[in-house]
Regions:
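Juxtamembrane helix-loop transition segments at the membrane interface in multi-pass membrane proteins
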Residues: 26-43, 105-127, 189-223, 288
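Transmembrane alpha-helix boundary signature
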Residues: 73-82, 106-113, 149-161
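Helix-coil boundary and interhelical linker segments in multi-pass alpha-helical membrane proteins
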Residues: 78-85, 157-170, 256-270
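Mid-bilayer segments of alpha-helical transmembrane spans in multi-pass integral membrane proteins
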Residues: 97-105, 141, 145, 149, ...
């Protein structure tokens, strides 16, 4: 046990393994059949719409991240002389925002792939459809925790090895910028995606059902595509960033509590090891439960 606590590189390795697992699952989902040409066309339209929204949203968010990151860097620099703050607070914020955005992007990509493949597989058997659906969910879940573990552990080890004169409190204070960055992206992704989702949903209902008398989700209603794009934007990309923010925030909060109660490096690192143990066991269960051979 003492060896494990002293070798923090195990945490980095677990994050890398989680992302390798994500890649394997993503490739497996991609290799499943999309069905006939009409199904592929509709799926491509939904995917193009979802990715276009994500591109526009992330483009606007990049300006926000740069401005706030620069402001935090400046404020951290001003506080170096009088507190445990540091100009690298802005760097932690930037890394957290990037990881949060990646979590949403990974979820969006695999969701738009898994949707049509699950539908096609359901024509053959419920088991095949569930296998694809669960694999798509595993990509999202393991992507969130893998990025969170890599980001948090990587930053902590970087600060610990580079700034050896820092106290434990200063490392944790600078590390909180990572959670702030993740929360900022989650806020805009969740709210922005939710607004688009509801606008598309209400618009499709009003125009289709009320004005034209077309049933909801009917193929003749062109707004159905926008409605499905909205479902992916709000319930996948927004949810992914939101989960990432909650995951990271819970770990950092536990690390701060460990420092406040025990002022010990072991108490600070314990939440990371617990998170590592939980998600690696879940990944092992998922790997055993799905036949990767299709």
């Amino acid at each position: 046990m003492e060896y494990i606590l002293e070798n923090k590189s195990i945490l980095l390795l677990s994050g890398v393994l989680a992302l390798i697992f994500v890649f394997i699952k993503d490739r497996w989902v991609s290799n499943q059949s999309v069905g006939n040409e009409k199904m592929a066309t509709i799926a491509n339209n939904i995917s193009d719409g979802a990715m276009s929204f994500l591109k526009a949203e992330y483009t606007m968010l990049s300006f926000f991240v740069i401005i706030v990151g620069g402001l935090l860097t400046y404020l951290g620099y001003l506080g170096e002389a009088t507190s445990t703050s540091h100009s690298l607070l802005g760097f932690s914020f930037l890394i957290g925002a990037i990881c949060s955005g990646l979590a949403g992007f990974i979820g969006m990509k695999v969701a738009t792939k898994a949707n049509v493949r699950t539908t096609n597989a359901a024509q053959n058997s419920l088991g095949e459809a569930l296998s694809i659906a669960f694999s798509g969910g595993a990509v999202m879940g393991l992507g969130v925790v893998g990025l969170g573990m890599l980001g948090l552990t990587g930053l902590y080890l970087f600060y610990e090895s580079t700034f050896t004169a820092w106290s434990l409190a200063q490392r944790l204070e600078v590390l909180t910028g990572f959670s702030f960055g993740a929360s900022s992206i989650a806020l805009f992704a969740r709210v922005g995606g939710g607004i688009y989702t509801k606008a598309a949903d209400v618009g499709a209902d009003l125009v289709g059902k009320v004005e034209a008398g077309i049933p909801e989700d009917h193929p003749l209603n062109p707004a159905t595509i926008a409605d499905n794009v909205g479902d992916n934007v709000g319930d996948v990309a927004g949810m992914g960033a939101d989960l990432f923010e909650s995951y990271v925030g819970a770990i950092i909060g536990s690390m701060v509590l460990g420092w406040a109660l025990f002022n010990s490096i072991d108490a600070v690192m314990l939440p990371l090891y617990i998170a590592c143990l939980l998600y690696t066991s879940d990944a092992a269960d998922e790997y055993r439960g799905v036949d990767l051979g299709g």
